[in-house]
Amino acid sequence: MADKLNEYVALIKNEIKKYSKQIFNSEIGKVISVADGIAKVSGLENALLNELIEFENNVQGIALNLEQNTVGVALFGDYSKIREGSTAKRTHNVMQTPVGDVMLGRIVNALGEPVDGRGPIKAEEFDQVEKIAPGVMTRKTVNQPLETGILTIDALFPIGKGQRELIVGDRQTGKTSIAIDTIINQRGKDVYCVYVAMGQKNSSVAQIVHQLEVTDSMKYTTVVCATASDPASMIYLTPFTGITIAEYWLKQGKDVLIVFDDLSKHAIAYRTLSLLLRRPPGREAFPGDVFYLHSRLLERACRLNEEHGGGSITALPIIETQAGDISAYIPTNVISITDGQLFMVSNLFNSGQRPAIHVGLSVSRVGSAAQIKAIKQQTGSLKLELAQYSELDSFSQFGSDLDENTKQILERGKRVMEMIKQPNGKPYSQTHEALFLFAIAKSFIKFIPLDYIAKFKQRIMEEFDKEHPIYKEIATQKSFSEALEAQTNTAFKALVKRFVSALPDYDITKYGTMEELE
């Protein structure tokens, strides 16, 4: 009996030791109304903006409207069991997402929860989804190239690490293909990638993930997705989750590439939320702060100086236009935020010119400083030539009386356009790009019949493989010295002679003279 008594006394003493005077304050409110994924909650007077609110049945939401007597909460997931009078509880936490290397190779939703069926993510670190972008004094100028592996972009519209380059165009013009090819091309280059899919079909996301898996690119990539079947609140949150995951590696001094596919659907989701929250509509029914929505997101992509780690986030936002109208509200907003745009055109795409980038309307504002010298040396007047060709080509449709000079410009233009064609999923190395551009700049392509240009490109890659001394020197020096240029010129003359000699019924006098190849 005494033993039992001593045991009880010990237990009571132990509980007294644990006693704390600290008061845990739990704020609980009531749902006034719920409809279309928005709950009006009363009794949460001290709620924070973007705070996570918990409801019954494990439903969560984010506080977006803080009014005098109520809080407007956008709900995540199935809210069918939430009724008027249901309880809502503050979590005292603003929206957070897991970050770190554990996110690599995973597919997560807007809340950072895995949706790939590969079990939970054992993250040790979490970070706030909404943050202020790095300040001016922490940044550094963009001067390192981000290799896309796409000849047109690397030659004419180079992208630097830390740049924001918009990809804009109608549906089905190859916008996502450019972004995915760029991710694939980062293999072995120590660049982490984040692909953010917003409002897309489940089948489209699955297809992209499959393409990344087949090319062994998921090892360094995280996919953040909110598909068309997800509520507007999830689509709204997705890009902020993506950039937060990318910022973890930025702080580690790493280079990151993030793709937002696409911000048009993101703006529509935000418009939906804003109208349901009864915020006043503006132009095209978008709320007044839709510019700030995208500017605060894209300003988080930057290049930091050495004192802050020297990392970078390069952003490729995608915008879908209607009937090629880039002067609409959202496209003009994002064009003014970003450091350049690639304008994709339907008629080029349909005519087989892929990637279908419009040379005249596309621009890269800061990337030229990041372009390697070997490519810069060969692209002096190429953009002007292509713009001139484009103008003359449309003019030549109306009449057949063309002078000799115009015919030469058109013939050269056709060959250049054929040279910059590139199949999907086949990125080029920068050295091969420099060699293609050398062939264009030194007019070796004029000897090649139009139908054989693709085979000639293949032959260049076979001839100048990674073991070739010229390839090795360009890859090392990143520029053409006088000696290297002369050496490359001689090698190309020999290559062209061998190539055309194998063509059936080839007559060199139609294209030039044999003396030019001596």
UniProtKB/Swiss-Prot annotation:
It comes from the Bacteria. The gene is atpA. Produces ATP from ADP in the presence of a proton gradient across the membrane. The alpha chain is a regulatory subunit. The keyword Transport applies. InterPro entries: ATP_synth_asu-like_sf, ATP_synth_asu_C, ATP_synth_asu_C_sf, ATP_synth_F1_a_nt-bd_dom, ATP_synth_F1_asu, ATPase_a/bsu_AS, ATPase_F1/V1/A1_a/bsu_N, ATPase_F1/V1/A1_a/bsu_N_sf. This is ATP synthase subunit alpha. GO terms for molecular function: ADP binding; ATP binding; proton-transporting ATP synthase activity, rotational mechanism. It comes from Mycoplasma pneumoniae (strain ATCC 29342 / M129 / Subtype 1). The record marks 362 as: Required for activity. CDD domains: ATP-synt_F1_alpha_C, ATP-synt_F1_alpha_N, F1-ATPase_alpha_CD.
